[in-house]
Amino acid sequence: MAVNMKGKSFLSINDLTLEEMYQVFDLSRTLKEKLYTGEEHHLLKGKTLGMIFSKPSTRTRISFEVGIYQLGGIGMYFGPNDLQLN
């Protein structure tokens, strides 16, 4: 049975139940299959996502930006200086 995760936020894997984790894995498998077959999917169409990382990592930031773009969204990176966290 599908769990409604609309509006749910999580920062750690511990924030998800086992059932929610399985649902995330199932969705990721489906999206990966669609990517490889060239099937269009825009799960994040019309969405803007803010990315905040505690440590600078170009590879991680680029990976997230590419993933968000592939899903039809817009990613915005905010560094520590942008958010006045220092």
Task: Give names to the regions the model predicted.
Residues 72-86:
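Short beta-strand elements in bilobed, periplasmic/extracellular small-molecule ligand-binding domains
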